[in-house]
Amino acid sequence: MSEEVLTDLAPLAENRSIALNCAGDALVIGSDTLLYRLLFNLAENAIRYSRSGSTVNVSISDSDSHVLLRVKDEGPGIPKQYRESIFQPFFRLDKSRSRAYGGAGLGLALVWEIAALHGGTVEVETSSENGTTMLVSLPKRSAALTEQ
């Protein structure tokens, strides 16, 4: 699925002269449509906020019970005081970012909801003026599926 997302986002990345890299692979049992949207939203944000000519890295690693998905960009970073607020619908750091980068302010809220639906979490792992790494931890078997 990660290759499909990156293929779908390749035109946007090429338009912004951003290289897309993906490393790793793992299996998560859950909604393919929702998991696609989760990764798409994270990678699209990374492309949108990265500087032209930079790189967006997607890495997927596997543990016994969880899959860890990291999306690293080379954008302006997220100040510490906003690292939880960014997952709220329509939240914007400032209006100028909204005009400059576009979007409706729903992407990260959807990522949060999709991760939670699958029994996972999402957080800002690291962030500075040199970029941000978003970390999603998903159980290999979706909580939504095991409850049925």
Specify the residue positions occupied by each region the protein language model found.
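Short conserved segment of the HATPase_c
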Residues: I78-R92
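Short helix-loop "hinge" at the ATP-lid/N-box region of the Bergerat-fold HATPase_c
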Residues: A46-I47
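Short conserved segments within the C-terminal catalytic ATPase subdomain
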Residues: P11-D25
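Acidic ATP/Mg2+-coordinating residue in the GHKL
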Residues: D73
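Conserved glycine-rich
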Residues: G119-G120
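Short beta-strand/loop element within the Bergerat-fold HATPase_c
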Residues: G53-S65
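Conserved micro-motifs of the catalytic ATP-binding
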Residues: L27-G30
